[in-house]
Amino acid sequence: YVYLAGGLFVLCRILLSFYRMFQLIRNGKRRSYGKYKLIVVSEPISSFCWGKYIVVSVSDYSQQSTDGILLHETMHLRYRHTLDLLCMQCLLILYWFNPAIWLLKRELQEVHEFEADNGVLNTGIDATRYQLLLVKKAVGTRLYSMANGFNHSKLKKRITMMLKERTNRW
């Protein structure tokens, strides 16, 4: 019964997160952004993406930093990070009692951020400007746990990874 109760608790948390996220998507103003749907919401949230949706706050949408934010979220969508997160949520429901699965989730999100940052930098955006954007966004609001977005706690590591010399694998 304890296993079942824990699994139901994790499932309820995930469903609540989905509900809140889809409320934002449903109530936001829709705009087209390439092959994705851009949702602009009035709530002061950190930008995130899920499926084909990129969700940004009105303040982020109206600032000059919009390009960097949208490019970052587009990279998450392009690399299909939503599928990874969805699989991880299913594993969390089944193996909620195992601390390793929670660590794996955190590491997966960190790798997603590294991949998105690398994708942004590969487009030719100014690295210093992008890093300043990350620092600026790090003082923002809490993220939705089900979605990709700017990860506050790993910011220094992300910037360090961006500054590393890239060497050829071969």
PLM features: residue spans?
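Membrane-embedded and juxtamembrane structural elements of multi-pass membrane proteins
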Residues: 1-170
